[in-house]
Amino acid sequence: GFFDKRMMLEQSSRMPFVIRYPKDLPQGTRNESLLMNIDIPALLLDYAQVKRPEQMQGESFRSLLKDDKLEGRPYTYYRYWEHSPDRPAHFGIRSSRYKLIHYYGKPLGMKSANAQATPPSWEFYDLETDPNELKNVFNEPSYQDLIVEMHASLINEKAFYEDHQTPVPDLE
């Protein structure tokens, strides 16, 4: 079965984040912006009025907490590298509605990864029509333009986060 937060599934990647700071945030404030765990330290530094180190990849989302009309990240990037046949290594991006995942299925010399490779594959989910991610629509014609667009964004996100270990393959 699945355990941990290893797979790029909504049940794993969606996490509540609760913060109490009455001086700045009204009680009951809710925000549905896309965030990544690397943004949390940047937020805490922002509230502590400490300059974010240049090498820190995360961004403070303080302004998003105060104004839900502001737009945050268009995508979140995810990478799982500890490959095994039942939990293949993969990376992907998620927008507010869609998710594109590539299972590259190779251990890439990682110490704790299983050496047995798995066939590479793609998955694409429309989280509005399929919130439980039960129907992979990667091969459906009506989604192809969006998949091509998200594929280009996946390449950009990997580069931005300096994840160069395995390239994003062409869509197949």
PLM feature spans:
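Conserved beta-strand positions that form and line the central face of beta-propeller blades
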Residues: 7-8, 17, 30, 60-63, ...
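C-terminal cap/loop subdomain of S1 sulfatases and analogous C-terminal strand-loop tails that border
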Residues: 38-41, 46-123, 127, 145, ...
